[in-house]
From Swiss-Prot:
Keywords: Endonuclease, Hydrolase, Metal-binding, Nuclease, tRNA processing, Zinc. It comes from the Bacteria. InterPro entries: Metallo-B-lactamas (IPR001279), RibonucZ/Hydroxyglut_hydro (IPR036866), RNase_Z/BN (IPR013471). Homodimer. This is Ribonuclease Z. Its EC number is 3.1.26.11. Its cofactor is Zn(2+). Zinc phosphodiesterase, which displays some tRNA 3'-processing endonuclease activity. Probably involved in tRNA maturation, by removing a 3'-trailer from precursor tRNA. The lineage of its organism: Bacteria, Bacillati, Cyanobacteriota, Cyanophyceae, Synechococcales. It comes from Prochlorococcus marinus (strain AS9601). Zn(2+) 2 binds at residues 66-67, 215, 273. Belongs to the RNase Z family. It catalyses: Endonucleolytic cleavage of RNA, removing extra 3' nucleotides from tRNA precursor, generating 3' termini of tRNAs. A 3'-hydroxy group is left at the tRNA terminus and a 5'-phosphoryl group is left at the trailer molecule. Zn(2+) 1 binds at residues 62, 64, 144, 215.
């Protein structure tokens, strides 16, 4: 899996950073999942390597405008293109009425179905939000001025590496049988021989995991959600020097994000959702924010618009 940042600014866009949105590309799939959709997200998608027609699920963290104002426009554009077969939208309970109202008021009729999933009960009861044979999604309540939710996407373990040489030495002809063996299935060859796929595969490979947490002040639930994750994307609206403001507005400082990564044993942290007050022309720069976080959690990286990062 990999992610592409489509917006990394907090509150309002700047000349170099749009407001919040992130695209997740799934492994061995053309499917894309979108996390938050601030104003201008569809323009950002056009400038990226993401195809809007591949978006199948949208996860919204909370109802502040810098995370949702791009949704009606994106959905309307997808409707005009006729490429979408339907989209699942996960988020707070108010999200359905916001989207339906915006579409109805602008006389927009979509050519595809929307399926809404309210996430609050899943977060409160620690229930799996979505699951198939390859992946599952969990969510958790964060700590912000309005209800906000973090999301975790976890791949299930993958089959071990297939030993082609062993198969060849046993004169098993290449073809669909190799795929069945790699999946650990038992197969019967035309000559009557029977093989168990487990004999040809190494130990299962651990699936990748990605966590997205914004908006929130430091939260123990974010730590729990991020436990042993490969990649945590966490908001860092404020510098540590503005910690008081962070508590007032219930946003995170760089240190809070780094502490979340450290306590959760996350492998890699990327900080995002930066306040526009921090620019290269001001006394505190985005580079300074990165250095603050790295003092607590060395494997920290700084998000920027259109940055693509592998989960592992």
């Amino acid at each position: 899996m990999n992610i592409t940042f489509l917006g990394t600014s907090s509150g309002v866009p700047s000349l170099t950073r749009n407001v919040s949105s992130l695209a997740l590309k799934l492994s061995q799939s053309a499917e894309v999942w979108l996390f938050d959709c601030g104003e201008g997200t569809q323009h950002q998608i056009m400038k990226s390597n993401i195809k809007s027609s591949q978006i199948k699920k949208i996860f919204i963290t909370h109802m502040h405008g810098d995370h949702i104002y791009g949704l009606p426009g994106l959905l309307a554009t997808l409707g005009l293109s006729g490429n979408s077969e339907g989209i699942e939208i996960y988020g707070p309970s108010e999200l359905r009425s916001f989207i339906n109202s915006a579409l109805k008021s602008s006389f927009c009729k979509l050519s595809f179905p929307l399926h809404f999933v309210e996430v609050e009960n899943f977060a409160l009861k620690n229930k799996i939000l979505f699951e198939n044979n390859k992946i599952k999604v969990n969510c958790a309540c964060l700590k912000h001025k309005i209800p906000a939710y973090g999301y975790r996407v976890s791949e299930k373990d993958k089959p071990g590496v297939f030993d082609i040489k062993k198969a060849e030495s046993l004169k098993i002809a290449p073809g669909p049988i190799y795929s069945e063996l790699q999946q650990g299935k038992k197969v019967v060859l035309p000559d009557g021989r029977t093989f168990d796929g487990k004999e040809f595969c190494g130990p299962p490979r651990e699936g990748e995991s990605f966590v997205y947490c914004t908006d929130t002040v430091f939260s123990e639930s974010a730590v729990s959600l991020s436990k042993n994750a490969d990649l945590l994307v966490h908001e860092s609206t404020f510098s540590q020097t503005d910690e008081r403001m962070a508590y007032e507005k219930l946003h995170s400082t760089t240190i809070m994000a780094a502490k979340t990564a450290l306590l959760s044993n996350t492998k890699k942290l990327i900080i995002t959702h930066l306040s526009p007050r921090y620019t290269n022309k001001n006394s505190i720069t985005p580079g300074d924010l990165l250095k603050e976080a790295q003092k607590v959690f060395p494997n920290t990286h700084l998000a920027k618009d259109f940055l693509t990062a592998e989960i592992k």
